[in-house]
Amino acid sequence: MKVALVGCGAVTQAVYVPLLSRRRELFEVAAVCDLSATLAGAVGDRLGVARRHTDLGEMLAEGGFDAVLMLASGSHGEPVRQALAAGYAVLCEKPLALTEAEVAALPEGRLMVGYMKQYDPAVRRAEEMLAELGGAAVIRSVEVTVLHPSAEAQLGFANLSQARDVDVAPLRAAENAVLDRALGAEAGPEVRSVYSVALGSICHDLSLLRRFTGSPVKVDHVETWGGLPGSIEISGPLPVAGRYSIRWHYLEDYPAYRETVVVHHASGSLELVFPAPYLMNAPTVLTAVSGAETRAEYREVTEAFETQLLAFHAFVTSGKPPLTDAAGALEDIVTAQRIAARYAVQHDLALGGEAGDR
């Protein structure tokens, strides 16, 4: 299957280039695109791709591929719209968009939204075990803790190429305009930070809640401390039974990324401990605690990003549905807006836009 890459930054270089290189029996990279000619050139060199673009519309019009991997940062709403309108299948890294309106504007087409932790073998095993126990109805609590060092700390090993040939000011202005539509132009930096973290990082945990219990329909409490982005605490009821709590901490100099998701049920617990996402084939550890204080560990080195790529291949070539489509991604956008709305109400902060109606 011939694919084109859009966005040649950190995730592309650290994750997708190595994976696409070792799965050449399934994927041929036909073109790359980035606003930075430097990054497009660097990724093109590593993959041996001659066609390198700095204009998405130009690349889509030229064609020569079956699908697009949308890997740039920020909102993907408009570039995904263009790719779908041109008839291409799309794998879009999260978040799909920053607003409900962007999702509503997407044409019909083959779209998969990438939340790689949904494809982690430990997560899939936890889903199976939870189903055997009785599903969402047996859950008493889902508790999430994320310890998040700086991106530089997480990617220091990767020797990434840097873009110094792009003026980022217009990009930031464009993203702020989209955030204005999500939160209202009057929303201040605190609300914008909470929303950005919710859609940029906590969305992984929202995607797991969707798999385990369904999306939260209510946010009871949101608190922050420690300066921006600092620490964020979120809690509320689960849609079937029990409650969820999420504690996300930006700790710039913390030794290593760590994410823990614990599902407590009437007869035990399921605990998932995720490593840094950019360390290929580092296993997530699933620990099941059951009767008589029995503990069983499950770990597998199959890479979640790679399994996600294989799922996209199956989606395009045989029509197997993805775990998250546009509707699932929209659920996360709505939950993130509810988080921002609850935070604004609790702290008497200005809020408008789509979130003002949540």
What are these regions (language model features)?
Residues 1-47:
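N-terminal Rossmann-like dinucleotide-binding module
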Residues 27-31, 66-68, 196:
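Short active-site oxyanion
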Residues 49-106:
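Beta-loop-alpha module in the N-terminal Rossmann-like domain of NAD(P)-dependent dehydrogenases
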Residues 67-69, 109-110, 226-228, 311-358:
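C-terminal helix-rich "cap/oligomerization" subdomain common to oxidoreductases
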Residues 97-168:
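A contiguous active-site-proximal alpha/beta segment in oxidoreductase catalytic domains
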Residues 119-143, 156-157, 182-186, 191-192, ...:
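Oxidoreductase and adenylate-handling cofactor-binding alpha/beta cores
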Residues 152-191:
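Charged, glycine/proline-rich intrinsically disordered loops and linkers
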Residues 189-278, 299, 306-320, 337, ...:
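Contiguous beta-strand/loop segments that form the cofactor/metal-binding neighborhood of enzyme cores
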